[in-house]
Amino acid sequence: MRRFITLTFATIICSAWNGRVVAQGNSAPSKKSSILPLTTREAKPGLRWWWLGSAVDKENLSWCLGEYAKAGVGAVEITPIYGVQGNDASDISYLSPKWMEMLRHVEAENKRLDIETGMATGTGWPFGGPWVPIEEAACKAFVVDTLVASVVKPESINFNIPDKERKFAKLKLLKSYPKDNGMQRVIALYESRTRQMVKRAAPGGEGYVVNHFDSIAVAHYLEHIEKAFEQTGTPYPHTFFNDSYEVYGANWTPTLFDEFAKRRGYRLEDKLDMFVDGDPQVVSDYRETLADMVLNNFTRQWTAWAHKHGAITRNQAHGSPANLIDCYSAVDIPEIEGFGLTDFGIRGLRKDEGYTRPNYSDLSMLKYAPSAAHVTGKKYTSSETFTWLTEHFRTSLSQMKPDLDLMFCAGVNHMFFHGTTYSPKDDPWPGWRFYASVDMSPNNSIWRDAPELMSYITRCQTYLQWGQPDNDFLVYLPVRDMWRNNTKNWLMMFDIHSMDKKAPDFISTILDIDKAGFDCDYISDNLLLSTDYAGGCLCTAAGTRYKGIIIPEGCVMPKDVEEHVKALGNKGAKVIYGHDKGDMERAANPEPMKSRHGLKIIRRSNDYGHHYFIANLTDHDVKASVPLAVTEKYGMWYNPMTNIYTKARLDAGELELNLRSGESRILVCANTEDIYPEGIAEERSSEGTGEIDITNGKWTLSFIEEQPKVGQAYKLDKLQTWETLGDSAAVTMGTGVYETEVKLSRDDARKHWTIDLGDVRESARVYINNVYIGCAWAVPFVLDCKDALKKGKNTIRIEVTNLPANRIADLDRKGVKWRKMKEINVVDINYKKTTYADWKPVESGIRKVVLVGN
């Protein structure tokens, strides 16, 4: 079938991964400064690569990887899941010799294409499989709490155990407590197994979830995977991945009583009644013990195992019943997750009411993984990006950028798309699909212009990986305050969906720090105890420096940590109790870009000064002169959308700032003019001196790469979107080509022009006089015409690519059976079975074009 093949027309491109980001184009500098960062493979975006049923073959693997490489992908992470209906004969059992052969083929192809190979350490999630015996499966405890006469022997009581537990439950502890009126309270604690099976498991991966608190069980689990590599001579991947902790109801392990006594200094058995009744201290100690066990017996052991085989680990710690900072810091690449779409209110950004869900990961949640990376000196923080950003088939490139920019400002610099489904090249559209959108693959119409997004990511991450973090404050993570709350339910999992309930005060503190113009990283007890004060700064064991530490008001701290903080203060460290703005300003310089104008930023230091990533995620343009918190004399703007450098107007520490709603920039500051590439220009004024509205002129509209074929061209008296033009146009997906002519006088031809496309649905490549000037794929949809416009007649060609929404709705109306995956198949954003037959036509194309001169 026809696919959306990537074609690269851009005149502004990134050089090879091991070269520098070099701008090519008439308005770009001819040579980049030698002190600016190199672009590496790690700066490119990665893909979570779903293998449905592991039903892959070498020909299609090579085709897929080739398409990913052409689009600008730098890494793939293989995650096998459930298969496709009626395709059982093609399924490949996980870790079988055939499966390992496919992995070797991927590794060989990726070496040729310079793509990094990663894989989940199992199928679906969490860790588990058929090789996990019930004795090593996730464990739980429950109690039967009863009141009986004191003359009754507790051992004689026939406790009412739930039927579903009788086969697995073992009496672990029986305790009696005298009560008034000749009664006694008897508590029986039973140990059982959750019997949770691996979610979304692939063939050969179905089985029990492993006990993450049991070091022996985890070791046995990893040994099974290791055996498959050793027996087949398959090279280990670059990276092993672990998804978010979703081991539900696992609140116990057989060794917990002894581990508790060793770590907490008293026997939990002696406090069983207090534990059952939810005593805050006892439950907090229990939760801390679980945290220690998942950290040491699972996360650290898994990472050590990967290192033994020359691999590294990438981990989502959220969901763990642990101090997230400790678990994130125990791996090589901590990874956070976005889940839903943030409503920033950006002007001109399309909204799709009823087809999106709120983003559970606000700035405070996104900062957990970057904090661990910063504090422990790890170079990369990754992200599971765009999970459930919108409903299936309705996600645009423009909707991706704002939430991505927020992740960048939180500290992410090594993003992964969630996700991409392996689908055979010739499978009828829409091919194989994963149930949680988005779909970043050649099966999606937006793939045509996805290389523009890929290039943007690569350029941003090149700078976000350069240098060192330069956040102002450490903030003590008050995990014990959280552990001491909601104690009737022993298990406390720190998943992104419930953090607003578990840590509302902490979230408020972090957002207040941000609004005051500062940035911060979270720190745990363990990492704080190894932090010292030297040279006027707090310095972590990894060498990351901070101007002070903020202790949230009234939080519970262990005595040794409290004494260490006091000792740091006695040495001269700035210790701030609460988060009073004045106290913070006495310790560090705020960034008025944040406090006055609401911009989101992250600042990093480098050998020559500092650099910023700045995003205007507000509903208004920002044009102002603002002081910077740093003192360098020279500034340079880098636009990662266009790959163009310009001199920044930086006078006596005041920066002239001009960012439209939705725009982002990189600012480089140094005390040397060596930062300037050869031929760099001054920043151009954005003041318009005239407009030419060509919306109502004569236009032609034709189609390329569309499915189904429209079969005709249209002559338009004014611009309009094409879903209203007829039955075939209303259901097609692909690219509509708008063409017109405009005449310029001699005086107008001397002006510098931009082209404003208004509300693009969804991305638009623009050619003027057959010269490609750029792709408008994100808000604001404005492009620089460079010197393409001439005196007299000028041809304008705009290739607009729409979403696949109208196409899939048409298939549902016709009863086409494309939902052919097993298990959960395809569901809507609320995890419900659905049809798209009732969707109204989604706008496709453009309605306005204005040339703006200055």
Segments from the language model and where they lie:
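Acidic/aromatic-lined carbohydrate-recognition and catalytic surfaces
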Residues: I81-K199, P203-N211
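Short acidic/polar inter-strand loop motif in beta-rich domains
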Residues: D674-I675, T801-D810
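Bacterial Sec-dependent N-terminal signal peptides
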Residues: M1-P29
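Mature N-terminal segment immediately following signal peptide/propeptide cleavage
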Residues: K32-A75
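Carbohydrate-binding surfaces of carbohydrate-active enzymes
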Residues: P45, D57, L61-S62, A75, ...
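Non-catalytic, glycine-rich low-complexity segments
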Residues: S34-T39, Q720-A730, G815-N854
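Aromatic-lined ligand-binding clefts that engage carbohydrates, nucleic acids, or primary amines
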Residues: P627, V742-N769, A776, I796-V800
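Extended acidic/polar, glycine-enriched regions
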Residues: K164-E230, D651-G690, K791-K793
